[in-house]
């Protein structure tokens, strides 16, 4: 049930969930979500609140459990991480052709003050280069960062 979060993170999320769960039944209802949104200065119509809950409510009971709450946070974090990976890839892919080459990696690292040998640079590309074409495409770049 940890979703890859540390014990400390789960405890933090549980505390936040408990603040939303006013009646302490282990679920966030439409009414409780509405109260939270009002506290945040957003007075959403009930249909919008129900739509929001339905996006997170994986078991279809019309409420958000702590497990569903964690799943939503996990999806958000993964989406955020994917955006960060895309941004880094785009910086390394200096000519914008969708690939990182040894030369682009060398240029990028030298701008950061890193000086690696040609062999070290080629090894870095080789580790990520699943299809062995001598360059790293975005999917390979993501796989490298997800697996490590």
UniProtKB/Swiss-Prot annotation:
Gene3D superfamilies: EF-hand (1.10.238.10). Pfam families: EF-hand_7 (PF13499). Keywords: Calcium, Metal-binding, Repeat. SMART domains: EFh (SM00054). One of its GO terms (biological process) is cellular response to leukemia inhibitory factor. The keyword tRNA processing does not apply. Ca(2+) 1 binds at residues 21, 23, 25, 27, 32. The keyword DNA-binding does not apply. Residues 8-43, 44-79, 80-115, 116-148 form the EF-hand domain. One of its GO terms (molecular function) is calcium ion binding. Ca(2+) 2 binds at residues 57, 59, 61, 63, 68. Ca(2+) 3 binds at residues 93, 95, 97, 99, 104. PROSITE patterns: EF_HAND_1, EF_HAND_2. Implicated in the early stage of ectopic ossification. This is Calmodulin-4.
